Amino acid sequence: MSETFDPRCVWFVGAGPGDRELITLKGYRLLQQAQVVIYAGSLINTELLDYCPAQAERYDSAELHLEQIIELMAAGVKAGKTVVRLQTGDVSLYGSVREQGEELTRRGIDWQVVPGVSAFLGAAAELGVEYTVPEVSQSLIITRLEGRTPVPAREQLEAFASHQTSMAIYLSVQRIHRVAERLIAGGYPATTPVAVIYKATWPESQTVRGTLADISDKVRDAGIRKTALILVGNFLGKEYHYSRLYAADFSHEYRKA
């Protein structure tokens, strides 16, 4: 028997990066049972709503402010309905889940999170790359340019660039010229590989490759101005070393050399 989800709480569900089949199984089951769905219509693949019952109430949060979103959630829970807040990617990245959760808690409403596949994971899968290449990069920085939401001074692009490790930069493609300038100023060579992925895993996905020196012009020529992720680092280059984990002369708990 399939699980019946508690209607006394709000379910925050990560919608995944775009491909409707990349939602988690639990997220899919929640949509199948949802009676109220509040979704980020400007960001998610709305084909996901096809998983919902025909009679489910559907609200596009792109048209709403925070208080209106909370009121819809609260009204649904009060009516004993299964309420799903469907957000792009994974809700823990640029998802505003804390402010929504705190408002619900203040009203005495429980809430739970179902994680999703974030765009940086979908982009890597689409490109067939890994962020942690042995002897090239073993770290990944996820960040963004400041916008209406400021970025702490210690987290400026120049500071991160000094590490010259793998980077995934969200919400910044409209200012990619500035991104490239600041990364070079911070320490990345101008020849550092860059990939810009528009709507990763969507049918209309598009990838532009270049270097910090020329990526801005290439992205402009491609007409990409939003809904794109910027990947930066030598993990995109040709240098590669095999992991020691699978080396024939390497022993570990499960295998002797």
Curated annotation (Swiss-Prot):
It holds the Pfam family TP_methylase. It comes from the Bacteria. It is an enzyme of class 2 (transferase). SUPFAM superfamilies: Tetrapyrrole methylase (SSF53790). CDD domains: Precorrin-4_C11-MT. GO terms for biological process: cobalamin biosynthetic process; methylation. It catalyses: Co-precorrin-4 + S-adenosyl-L-methionine = Co-precorrin-5A + S-adenosyl-L-homocysteine + H(+). Belongs to the precorrin methyltransferase family. Keywords: Cobalamin biosynthesis, Methyltransferase, S-adenosyl-L-methionine, Transferase. Pathway: Cofactor biosynthesis; adenosylcobalamin biosynthesis; cob(II)yrinate a,c-diamide from sirohydrochlorin (anaerobic route): step 4/10. One of its GO terms (molecular function) is precorrin-4 C11-methyltransferase activity. This is Cobalt-precorrin-4 C(11)-methyltransferase. Its EC number is 2.1.1.271.
